[in-house]
Amino acid sequence: MRVTGLVFMKSYNDLEVYQLAYELAIRVHKLTMTLPKYEMFEQGSQIRRSSKSIKDNIAEGYGRKKYKNDFIRFLIYSHASCDETISQLNMINDIHFEDNSLKGIIEEYNVLGAKLNRFINYVENNWK
């Protein structure tokens, strides 16, 4: 809802970066279920944790939004988890997907990383 140019968010669910991170985490989870069994508990487990960490750190940081520096710290953790997820996806793509079929989701994570970076800058410069 917009009132006089300000955006009011009732919950972290209203944040575009959270919504995108949540959607991508679900896709990564489903993707890992198609990996060979020996990868389910190693590479698969690691990427499931890193992809879910993105959304979870956004949510936890939003819960501390009253404390700007805490909020920023959790958003930075989220961005770092996004980078980790991209690294994991690249490894899985190179090992298990010779057709480079994960390039699309890798690009979506790059977009999420850019959006997180812009949101971090917004919070740093505009959050009261």
Q: What spans do the regions from the language model cover?
A:
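Amphipathic alpha-helical assembly/interaction segments
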Residues: M1-K128
